[in-house]
């Protein structure tokens, strides 16, 4: 789900299939490995020159993409939504509800430079997303799981949090850095036999996927949960609804799922548990909200 877009954990792979058991057989000696590591370290140092911090959590991020580039892509993607998706009429109850919640969240986002807009798409899919620049899209299939206005705020504030933290730009920056490291490693390995290069690049690909890409995707989702919880509390919605929403969402999606370390998203139960731990802080924020409304209007 846009409730569904690297540090967290590492990958342990117990199989040695496809990997050399003898360093000389693979044709990779200690010097080549050290050169490769030095190349990757150099790319990492260059990347740090583009660091920024995520809002609320303060996590340091690699950011090489100008935000205006992200916003331009978001604006184009939002125009495509209007062309390609069946929208719910703007005067319908669902559209008015999504618009109202969106206005409240936008009002506490501290991004008055965004051109905030909302759309409701007629679809049974349980999905929502926010595009750079403040374009929020909600599929009406998720509304029954929301149950009430605060549940909808959980979904929408989570998606807005991805944009405020510029997770899309961070992922593009990380991919750019990984591509640069791969090029550097390929250069170091250029004089090795093809089989040695293939083995090394396969291992590199697995390491970056399971040790960098997937853990950071989960990190982004958890961070969006954290930021979103504080946003909904600022906007006047009871943050206690957040773990309840994820419990309902898990119950509504009981099909077989991949193990968490193979997934881009944390397990739903873990999300609910993590949000419970953040509730005391979020409730303090909620008590200072200008216009607290609790769970708001019932949806079902």
Each model region followed by its residue ranges:
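A Zn2+-metalloprotease active-site environment signal
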Residues: 2-300
